[in-house]
């Protein structure tokens, strides 16, 4: 069976534009979460914090005109613009841009998103109601379709092996990478750029999640403290925006062109809660089986596992269920959960929804490569029962030799996924 490696990375998040910027800020314990106070459209909404991408012309800020021509801005929704941004960095990093037609024929795209961009749909609906159909943009449908990130990336670079989109809520980015992994193993492509993108910080989304009691409201006066996975004072997630991309490549193909290899992707596990549309099963069954199946495909045991990048969104129910699942996985092989490192980068960037699994995969790959555990910000103490607690890497990054790591993503609708990354060895 073919082996698959990671040869390129790209990211734009609330921590900044670019993988190097993201990793440095993550490891230094910085936060990209800011206040929404002062914006009248959010005045009546209980949650007033969000993980917002820094925009501007400075080196580490995101300037859309570096990635999309001015004349095309009205045609391309923000979540697609972000996908083009992360894809551009990942492909450049992988040295996979100036390629011939045969290579394009063997290259595909897998991208995920949860909501995409509601702004354009809402705006055009307003235009229809106020000015009638003559004023409605003929481009509105092509702007809001969820598969546009994959479509635009494919078109820009001429990749024709496959063009695939996952729309599985907060697991979409993870599923896109996992599907790409399997596509390469099955011989459908030699190279696939995979990831996720999301840009849905708008009043309707924030109001909807607020009404569902999903978002943090306690820390409106202290935004950087609002996202606090596993901490006793957590009260909901912080919505965020961004995109991340990884270049997945068949091993022999990568070796033949002397590509730089970050890590190997070796497992992809899936499971369904079949319990509740928005809440996880408290016993963590689906999370457990997703991780177990990921390790099984990798041909590994939980005894060989060194780190888990948790989905942990800073919600009361979700963080406990995931901790229970992780503890069960470790106890299967008689390991001590309290000594096992588990961290969540959502304390730093918030919850990027459909892009979460993609950026967290980037962080996990770098954890494996560099041997540094990202911290869980704002962790003081946990209310999770003692027997289910892990080492949550509180507030400060630490060095550790990492050979095998999991990255978890779970979503509304009961969807669960886990990716297994391994230090690359010949």
From Swiss-Prot:
One of its GO terms (cellular component) is mitochondrion. Keywords: Acyltransferase, Fatty acid biosynthesis, Fatty acid metabolism, Lipid biosynthesis, Lipid metabolism, Mitochondrion, Transferase, Transit peptide. Residues 1-18 form a transit peptide. Residues 19-423 form the Ketosynthase family 3 (KS3) domain. GO terms for biological process: fatty acid biosynthetic process. It comes from the Eukaryota. It is an enzyme of class 2 (transferase). It is found in: Mitochondrion. Gene3D superfamilies: 3.40.47.10. Pfam families: ketoacyl-synt, Ketoacyl-synt_C. Pathway: Lipid metabolism; fatty acid biosynthesis. It catalyses: a fatty acyl-[ACP] + malonyl-[ACP] + H(+) = a 3-oxoacyl-[ACP] + holo-[ACP] + CO2; butanoyl-[ACP] + malonyl-[ACP] + H(+) = 3-oxohexanoyl-[ACP] + holo-[ACP] + CO2; hexanoyl-[ACP] + malonyl-[ACP] + H(+) = 3-oxooctanoyl-[ACP] + holo-[ACP] + CO2; octanoyl-[ACP] + malonyl-[ACP] + H(+) = 3-oxodecanoyl-[ACP] + holo-[ACP] + CO2. GO terms for molecular function: 3-oxoacyl-[acyl-carrier-protein] synthase activity. NCBIfam families: fabF, PRK07314.1. Belongs to the thiolase-like superfamily. Beta-ketoacyl-ACP synthases family. May play a role in the biosynthesis of lipoic acid as well as longer chain fatty acids required for optimal mitochondrial function. This is Putative 3-oxoacyl-[acyl-carrier-protein] synthase, mitochondrial.
